[in-house]
């Protein structure tokens, strides 16, 4: 006979529904471990069905080592904002960012094949699949990035509960406690303004030529004479640099300073040059096309699947 305690134990072990647990235990003559396997098999089958659904919600998670010399950032997606704040989902996202920081891999695909940092008996991809079965939504480790520095600091900033995450690499020959605060200021700038490039050197030729052509056509359409068009184009390109290159942007906390000027002032105080060497900015779901479905159609679809 299947007792309430047996059902409770199986629910705690698997997170499956009460009736599913009871059916599995009945099927396995009360053998708890076999029932776990049965539910996993059913859960994995359900997870496979869910894998085709769009996962555009989720969170961005970062991890910084205690010495602030290494950092990582990951985007972990799910289908709804409800699951994105689920304790188990957030815990897994945070563990994935920590694992990425200490791993030798450089892509999400490679990380999925590693042993899971919190339970080395499982691969990362299997842990994700288990959570898909448990929470009933498709999930996807979309991307990861890492930064490290010998002299300087790595700092992160998370905005909006994981909607935006930023990783910043600040280089400085002198170790100073204030570097962390400066790096956070820069990370907040990146979160707020979403710069496309670190500096002018990072702007590729194709992008630059495309912008020049757009500005050239705009100037000609405004009826400007040919001789002044090039001057106008260069003026607008300089404006483009100031808007899209991090070090040339006006600092959001004090519009009298550019980021370069702010770092120069801080360099004087510390007594050593401070430079931003790299940054990574992730915004959850950016670039993912989310299918909008009619609620009534969605309910009908689920009813049809249940037949």
From Swiss-Prot:
Residues 80-83 are annotated as: Involved in Mg(2+) ion dislocation from EF-Tu. InterPro entries: EF-Ts_dimer_sf, Transl_elong_EFTs/EF1B, Transl_elong_EFTs/EF1B_dimer, Transl_elong_Ts_CS, UBA-like_sf. It is found in: Cytoplasm. Pfam families: EF_TS. GO terms for molecular function: translation elongation factor activity. One of its GO terms (cellular component) is cytoplasm. The keyword Protein biosynthesis applies. It comes from the Bacteria. Keywords: Cytoplasm, Elongation factor, Protein biosynthesis. Associates with the EF-Tu.GDP complex and induces the exchange of GDP to GTP. It remains bound to the aminoacyl-tRNA.EF-Tu.GTP complex up to the GTP hydrolysis stage on the ribosome. Belongs to the EF-Ts family. This is Elongation factor Ts. The lineage of its organism: Bacteria, Bacillati, Bacillota, Clostridia, Eubacteriales. The gene is tsf.
């Amino acid at each position: 006979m299947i007792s309430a305690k047996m059902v409770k134990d199986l629910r705690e072990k698997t997170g499956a529904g009460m009736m599913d647990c009871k059916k599995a235990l009945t099927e396995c003559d009360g053998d708890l471990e076999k029932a776990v396997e049965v539910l996993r098999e059913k859960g994995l089958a359900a997870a496979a069905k869910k894998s085709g659904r769009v996962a555009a919600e989720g969170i961005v998670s970062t991890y910084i080592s205690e010495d602030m010399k290494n950092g990582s950032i990951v985007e972990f997606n799910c289908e709804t904002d409800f699951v994105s704040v689920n304790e188990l989902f957030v815990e897994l996202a945070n563990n994935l960012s920590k694992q990425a920081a200490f791993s030798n891999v450089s892509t999400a695909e490679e990380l999925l094949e590693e042993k899971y940092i919190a339970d080395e008996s499982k691969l990362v991809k299997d842990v994700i699949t288990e959570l898909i079965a448990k929470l009933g939504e498709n999930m996807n480790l979309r991307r990861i990035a890492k930064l490290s520095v010998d002299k300087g600091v790595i700092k992160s900033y998370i905005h909006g509960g994981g909607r935006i995450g930023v990783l910043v690499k600040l280089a400085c020959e002198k170790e100073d406690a204030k570097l962390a605060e400066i790096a956070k200021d820069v990370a907040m700038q990146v979160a707020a303004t979403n710069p496309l490039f670190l500096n002018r050197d990072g702007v590729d030729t194709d992008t630059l030529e495309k912008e020049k052509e757009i500005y050239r056509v705009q100037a000609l359409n405004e009826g400007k004479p040919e001789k002044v068009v090039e001057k106008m184009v260069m003026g607008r390109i300089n404006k483009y640099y100031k808007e899209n290159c991090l070090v040339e942007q006006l600092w959001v906390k004090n519009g009298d300073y550019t980021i370069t000027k702010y770092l120069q002032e801080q360099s004087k105080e510390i007594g050593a040059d401070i430079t931003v060497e790299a940054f990574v900015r992730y915004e959850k779901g950016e670039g993912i096309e989310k299918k909008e479905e009619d609620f009534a159609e969605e309910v009908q679809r689920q009813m049809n699947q249940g037949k």
